[in-house]
């Protein structure tokens, strides 16, 4: 109905309005995606990229008319995950080359668990590597 009303108002054919405006701007839902992450460990000279799955996408948010003390927003986060182990190459003797990283199995929109997730507005990218930053003495 809305495309017809807009078409009538704007004098255009309904065929140029194939989707309702809200559907046209629909964002991807919270879901598993493949992501390259950089693994690194103190004492090892290089980062190593690995492919894993992470949770990414949008969750329904709310902005209540009457402000309450405890307003929270749902974020796209892990429902289930497991961990994989990887051995970094080129680590010197005496440094354990083993690192463990999470692999998302399923996702959901829920409260952010600050002890296991990065809930900041703009966090470091998954492929960020501290070894790539020059250190000046």
Swiss-Prot record:
It is found in: Secreted. Disulfide bonds join 30-76, 44-91, 47-129, 55-107, 59-109, 112-119. GO terms for cellular component: cytoplasm; extracellular space. One of its GO terms (biological process) is ovulation. Residues 1-24 form the signal peptide. PROSITE patterns: GLYCO_HORMONE_BETA_1, GLYCO_HORMONE_BETA_2. Glycans are attached at residue 34. Pfam families: Cys_knot. One of its GO terms (molecular function) is hormone activity. Keywords: Disulfide bond, Glycoprotein, Hormone, Secreted, Signal. InterPro entries: Cystine-knot_cytokine, Glyco_hormone_CN, Gonadotropin_bsu, Gonadotropin_bsu_CS. PANTHER family: GLYCOPROTEIN HORMONE BETA CHAIN, LUTROPIN SUBUNIT BETA. Belongs to the glycoprotein hormones subunit beta family. Involved in gametogenesis and steroidogenesis. Heterodimer of an alpha and a beta chain. This is Gonadotropin subunit beta-2. The gene is cgbb.
């Amino acid at each position: 109905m809305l495309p017809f009303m807009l078409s009538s108002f704007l004098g255009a054919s309904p065929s140029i309005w194939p989707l309702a405006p809200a559907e046209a701007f629909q964002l991807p839902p919270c879901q598993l995606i493949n992501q390259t992450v950089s693994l690194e460990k103190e004492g090892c000279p290089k980062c190593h990229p690995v492919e894993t799955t992470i949770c990414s996408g949008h969750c329904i948010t709310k902005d209540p008319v009457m402000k309450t003390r405890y307003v929270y927003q749902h974020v796209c986060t892990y429902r289930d995950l497991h961990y994989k182990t990887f051995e970094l190459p080129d680590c010197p003797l005496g440094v354990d080359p083993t690192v463990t990283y999470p692999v998302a199995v399923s996702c959901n929109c829920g409260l952010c668990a600050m002890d296991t997730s990065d809930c900041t507005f703009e966090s470091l990218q998954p492929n960020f590597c501290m070894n790539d930053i020059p250190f000046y003495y």
